[in-house]
């Protein structure tokens, strides 16, 4: 199967590419390069060719001959979305729907979209299934709901959209992110000797390792059409519905000698538990191989190997919002997050 995947140089994309190749697929990546500075370590894996291009600029001609698309490239996570809700809506909702339409027009048969369990919002102890009411609290989560709605409406006998509602990701990637809860707490523990939870640790968060997300993507690509046509799947495992305090305790135990601290109850009311029964029923080859404890151990091993320090841990390329702010503040990106050509930054030099 010829597979195009967007966000190829991102946190998940850097792990997905080798997974697609090892699964026997002819893969090609697309990435505009917003986070290319964030390379933490070399995993030695062979990767598909990655074309440097903004997904918004792709045409139906570019997509001709592609059997399936995996769409990862969006402005990721809630804090980033709230920083500029209008831009988030333009890129994540309008941009993703327009891209899906181009895929359909080009003859792409399967469209796997990376959605999120964050659409469930604040549900407390209720176990959320794919048919539960959604309660998106942020621009990022609202966009996920809207994309699912609008792309599902495109489904027909020739076009099969699939929506993977990923739990909160964790784990090591060459394109590392430190703005995800387990990764962040682990980085703090290793570099500063503290596990700092800004809230009281009571919010509930389902977690899923990026390797397991990539496995779910491959399963969604390879499944019979009738098993996935227009379907949404929560991606994770019910044993990994954690309270944030439980995640913090696991990190504290993994990084011996670290000091665990909690803050007051925060204003963020997002808290949800999720059922993952449906994905096991429809995609029986999928199962999570990682849990939070194994993920913390993996991160510790990586940190020890590369001798992670506070400077690297706190560097902008490993935190989505900080890196985008840097690129905009230095005028490398325009207000619509498109790269500013060097000739526009140095007109006198370009004129020579």
Where in the sequence are the language-model features?
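N-terminal Rossmann/SDR dinucleotide-binding element
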Residues: 1-68
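SDR active-site strand-loop-helix element
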Residues: 6, 30, 69-72, 111-117, ...
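Conserved catalytic-core motifs of eukaryotic protein kinase domains, centered on the activation segment
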Residues: 39-41, 79-86, 122-126, 174-175
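NAD(P)H-binding glycine-rich loop region in Rossmannoid oxidoreductase-like domains
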Residues: 55-91
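Glycine-rich NAD(P)-binding loop of the Rossmann-fold in SDR/ketoreductase-type enzymes
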Residues: 87-98, 134, 138, 142-143, ...
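Conserved Rossmann-fold NAD(P)-dependent oxidoreductase catalytic core, especially the SDR/UDP-sugar
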Residues: 97-139
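NAD(P)-dependent short-chain dehydrogenase/reductase
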Residues: 149-205, 210-219, 249-254
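C-terminal substrate-binding subdomain of Rossmann-fold SDR/epimerase-dehydratase oxidoreductases
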Residues: 193, 198-352
């Amino acid at each position: 199967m010829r597979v195009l995947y967007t966000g190829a140089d991102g946190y998940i994309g850097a792990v997905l590419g080798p997974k697609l190749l090892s699964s026997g697929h002819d893969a090609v990546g697309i990435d505009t390069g917003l986070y290319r500075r964030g390379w933490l370590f070399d995993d030695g894996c062979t990767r598909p060719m990655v074309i440097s291009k903004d997904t918004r600029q792709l045409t139906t001609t570019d997509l001709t001959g592609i059997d399936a698309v995996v769409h990862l490239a969006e402005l990721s996570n809630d804090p980033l979305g709230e920083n500029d809700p209008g831009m988030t809506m333009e890129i994540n909702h309008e941009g993703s729907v327009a891209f899906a339409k181009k895929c359909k027009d080009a003859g792409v048969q399967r469209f796997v979209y990376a959605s999120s369990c964050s659409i469930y919002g604040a549900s407390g102890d209720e176990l959320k299934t794919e048919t539960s009411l959604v309660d998106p609290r942020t621009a990022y989560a609202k966009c996920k709901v809207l994309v699912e709605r609008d792309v599902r409406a495109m489904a027909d006998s020739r076009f099969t959209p699939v929506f993977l509602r990923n739990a909160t990701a964790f784990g090591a990637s060459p394109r590392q992110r430190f703005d995800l809860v387990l990764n962040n707490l682990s980085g703090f523990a290793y570099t500063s000797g503290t596990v700092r939870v800004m809230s009281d640790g009571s919010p509930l968060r389902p977690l899923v390792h990026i390797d397991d997300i990539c496995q779910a993507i491959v399963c969604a690509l390879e499944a019979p059409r009738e098993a996935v046509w227009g379907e949404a799947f929560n991606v994770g495992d019910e044993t990994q519905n954690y309270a944030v305090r439980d995640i913090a305790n696991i990190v504290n135990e993994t990084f011996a000698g670290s000091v665990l601290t909690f803050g007051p109850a925060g204003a963020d009311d997002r808290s949800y538990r999720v059922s993952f029964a449906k994905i096991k029923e429809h995609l029986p080859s999928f199962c999570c191989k990682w849990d939070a404890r194994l993920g913390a151990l993996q991160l510790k091993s990586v940190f020890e190997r590369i001798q992670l320090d506070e400077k690297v841990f706190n560097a902008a390329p490993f935190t989505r919002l900080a890196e985008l702010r840097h690129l905009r503040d230095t005028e490398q990106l325009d207000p619509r997050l498109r790269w500013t050509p060097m000739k526009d930054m140095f007109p006198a030099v370009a004129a020579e």
